[in-house]
């Protein structure tokens, strides 16, 4: 019964992260933080599911590896944007320019 409440809590937190991701379109840092929060909630759901079904947790290690790669790519884009433009506002420059 406790696992069911944990599933509902993780799903609600994932939905809140999605709402923040959709509503914060001005700053790249807020967007990246909400994406990482959503990935963390997906990891917790995956971990609870694998423990509940008595599966091995090797897939969660692969999932975390890809999540770290996604985070590093997002931070590298953030650093390059701050170096070239001085801020992380999406409205201060055109994304389509090279």
Swiss-Prot record:
Location of this chain's protein in the cell: Mitochondrion membrane
Membrane topology of this protein: Multi-pass membrane protein
Major subcellular location class: mitochondrion
UniProt GO BP: ATP synthesis coupled electron transport
Enzyme class: translocase
InterPro entries: NADH_UbQ_OxRdtase_chain4L/K, NUOK/Mnh_C1-like
Keyword Iron: no
Pfam families referenced in this protein's UniProt entry, alphabetically: Oxidored_q2
Membrane spanning residue stretches: 2-22, 28-48, 62-82
Catalytic function, reaction form: a ubiquinone + NADH + 5 H(+)(in) = a ubiquinol + NAD(+) + 4 H(+)(out)
Superkingdom of the source species: Eukaryota
Molecular function terms from GO: NADH dehydrogenase (ubiquinone) activity
Keyword Cytoplasm set for record: no
Keywords from the UniProt entry: Electron transport, Membrane, Mitochondrion, NAD, Respiratory chain, Translocase, Transmembrane, Transmembrane helix, Transport, Ubiquinone
Signal peptide (residue range): none
Cellular component per GO, a single term: mitochondrial membrane
EC number(s) stated in the UniProt entry for this protein: 7.1.1.2
Family statement drawn from the similarity comment of this UniProt entry: Belongs to the complex I subunit 4L family.
Database matches in PANTHER family: NADH-UBIQUINONE OXIDOREDUCTASE CHAIN 4L (PTHR11434:SF0), NADH-UBIQUINONE OXIDOREDUCTASE SUBUNIT ND4L (PTHR11434)
Its biological purpose: Core subunit of the mitochondrial membrane respiratory chain NADH dehydrogenase (Complex I) that is believed to belong to the minimal assembly required for catalysis. Complex I functions in the transfer of electrons from NADH to the respiratory chain. The immediate electron acceptor for the enzyme is believed to be ubiquinone.
Protein name: NADH-ubiquinone oxidoreductase chain 4L
Organism encoding this protein: Aedes aegypti
Lineage: Eukaryota, Metazoa, Ecdysozoa, Arthropoda, Hexapoda
